[in-house]
Amino acid sequence: NTVVNDYVVRAAEKLRSEKQKSSRISVFIRTSPFDDNESYRAIKSYSFIYPTDDSRDFLYAVRKILPKIYRPNYRYSKAGIMLSSFSDIGYVQNSLFNESHTYKMDSKLMQVIDELNLNQKQIYIASQNIGRFKPIQRNMISPRYTTRWSDLPTVK
């Protein structure tokens, strides 16, 4: 759950940096496709009434979705999220019942968090995987001959 929450927060940060909002989030989990004994995969989506870029909204949706697709006693090998139904931040249609003053405060809060986290993570949302997240290890990666000069082999 905490790894998925990290993905959600990172996706929301990217969404805000691109001045976009999303009105749909999908969460997926699966076991290894090579393990014949226990194969399981599931995906479920949550649609918002109004497009959002708020990390807390996406985390709320994940808390609703995960219990519906999670099955105990499986060894999951992959989990992830997908955002869809994008709209530009300036083209969001408001409703008569939409509380725009809270939207402005929420937007400002996310902006402040993004500014503080710009160079180094300083603020986390409580459900994130603080300090336990291991970045992808790149010690077994293949050389990038076509995109990096330093990876080209030299002939002597």
Enumerate the predicted regions with their spans.
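Basic, low-complexity intrinsically disordered segments
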Residues: 1-156
